[in-house]
Amino acid sequence: MIGALKVIREYKTYEKGEEIIFATQRGYGDLKGGWEFPGGKIEEGETSQAALQREIMEELDTEISVGELIDTIEYDYPTFHLSMDCFWSEIIKGDLVLKEHEAAKWLTKEKMDSVEWLPADITIVGKIKEALR
């Protein structure tokens, strides 16, 4: 299975000027309830970047621009292997409407460990924390 994961790095700031990251709580399947960065599967003929844009529009009714690749994560779950390309992304327009997720949060670097991440996302969380101001 090829997966595309995008990380929304929104440049909204708090009073302190901290960058914040958008995370969602999975609302379906065996991994329901775990926290992840929104994204989804690549369809035949799609690039990872195009898949991210499509998935975010479908799942969150939001248009994004896809930026730099953070990393490609390989993870073996008990029933499948996940390969996911992780990108920095920014919102172009939309209000991040939750269509498939149970909940969502904007997280600062300090709050990244406040949710229970899905196993495949834990590695990328560390890389994101290193990159944030």
Task: Please report, for each region that a protein language model flagged, where it lies by residue.
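Conserved N-terminal beta-strand and adjoining loop/helix that marks the start
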Residues: 1-21
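Structural detector for helix-capping/boundary residues
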Residues: 40, 54-55, 67, 102, ...
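Conserved Nudix-box catalytic region and its N-terminal flanking loop in Nudix hydrolases
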Residues: 19-58
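A generic structural signal for short beta-strands and their flanking turns/coil linkers
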Residues: 20, 31-33, 38, 62-65, ...
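Active-site-adjacent beta-strand/loop module that shapes the phosphate/pyrophosphate-binding cleft
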Residues: 10, 63-65, 72-95, 103-105, ...
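Hydrophobic packing within well-folded, soluble alpha/beta domains
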Residues: 48, 52-57, 69, 87, ...
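Nudix hydrolase/Nudix homology domain
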Residues: 30, 97-133
